[in-house]
Amino acid sequence: MPARTTQMLRDTPDAQARVSEAESLVRAARLFLFDSLDRLWATLLATGEVTMEARANARLAASHAVASAVRAIDLMYVAGGASSLYASCPLERAFRDVHAMTQHIGVHPRVMHSTGRVLLGLEPDTPLL
């Protein structure tokens, strides 16, 4: 329940809309990630190798999944209002955890640069791919 109100957060139209948007973000990102990993695995089984394109696509999907998770949690964090600031609120922990994920080298913004290079037919500029 948000601070200074008797209405449950789940009963507010704003929270309901944000939940819908967050759900669509997470589901779409999950499908993209699983699809890219399925394609990578199929390529590996068929050829014994993983192509640069498949690796770039999987890395892109992972980065997108993290960005989508951040956006989804941010939507809920804002909906929670000032209550989201308190350690007793589950949104506070989710906010910290999801933003901590953004600091991982595997989803660093530079990954988008490298995957973009591969998508444009250029060599990646990082050994991570």
PLM regions: where:
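Short segments within alpha-helical structural elements
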Residues: 71-78, 109-113
